[in-house]
Amino acid sequence: TENLNVLDYDIYFSATDLILENNIPELLILFNKTLSLGFDGHHFITGLASHFRDLMVCQHPDTLNLLEVGEDVTKQYQDQSKKASKQFLLKAIDLANECDLQYKTSKNQRLLVELTLMKLASITFDGEKKKLIS
């Protein structure tokens, strides 16, 4: 996939697992590895936004046909979509889309994506903290 300049589905499945685990250090390492393969941050974050969209599509049988991937990958999407709430996915799509919109005008694009990744990995963590406090 490196030659085609197309990021593999596995990168996004891995990134999403790390986000759901609130694992910011490993997520930043994965992003750095992706950059070192020659991909840019914009490509990474827009792909991640699409991945979140596809996970949301998997959560309802009526929208499953909107997923344009093979059977094996569809199964992976369905499995991962069970781990992510609709609220999480909406927030994640919103954050990734916001990063996409700001990317071209950002003076520090890498930091913008890294900050977005940290925010993404904190979505469910914040919820846990709120539960502990109340």
Feature annotation, model-predicted:
Residues 1-133:
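Extended, largely alpha-helical regulatory/partner-binding modules appended to the mid-to-C-terminal parts
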